């Protein structure tokens, strides 16, 4: 798998259609993960929530096929640490996640963490991924991979979004 860091949305424009197509098959298909939504969110830096942020979207390809997208940015988090956060964090968007098919999640996370540790080693001290859905398989995969690396993994509930489960025939 070949990983690439994108620091501008212009470099991602050619992937816009593939991004949204993959989202439809992804572990989490939420409107807050659509290409245009995250591009527009980035243009306003989350409505001004992150004035000192730098884009750090990572894509992974294999044989010219898009395998996964980590829609990230770099900023100092609320604890004062340099961190990689999910685009859309924290107050504006609910239900953020990686964009990857379920079958590719484990190997994508493993390769992503290798890539981030080797390509951006001085740019972050934390992966501060808020607004992940409680049922997201990213949580278990990330915990397993970080544990295997000897990294600290912390999971907390942060202002859960309300929802109402509707019957299938609604």
Q: How should each PLM-predicted stretch be described?
A:
Residues 1-170:
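N-acyltransferase acceptor-side catalytic subdomain
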């Amino acid at each position: 798998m070949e990983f690439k860091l994108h620091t501008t949305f212009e470099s991602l424009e050619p992937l816009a259609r593939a991004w949204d197509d993959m989202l439809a098959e992804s572990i989490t298909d939420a409107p807050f993960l659509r290409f245009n939504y995250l591009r527009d969110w980035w243009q306003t830096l989350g409505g001004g929530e992150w004035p000192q942020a730098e884009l750090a979207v990572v894509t992974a390809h294999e044989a010219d096929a898009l395998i996964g997208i980590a829609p990230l940015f770099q900023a100092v988090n609320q604890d004062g640490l340099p961190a990689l956060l999910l685009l859309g964090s924290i107050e504006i968007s609910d239900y953020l996640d990686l964009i990857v098919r379920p079958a590719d999640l484990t190997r994508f996370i493993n390769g992503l963490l290798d890539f981030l540790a080797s390509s951006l080693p001085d740019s972050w001290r934390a992966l501060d991924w808020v607004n992940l859905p409680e049922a997201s398989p990213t949580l278990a995969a990330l915990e397993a991979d970080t544990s295997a690396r000897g990294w600290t993994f912390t999971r907390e509930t942060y202002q859960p979004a309300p929802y109402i489960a509707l019957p299938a025939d609604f």
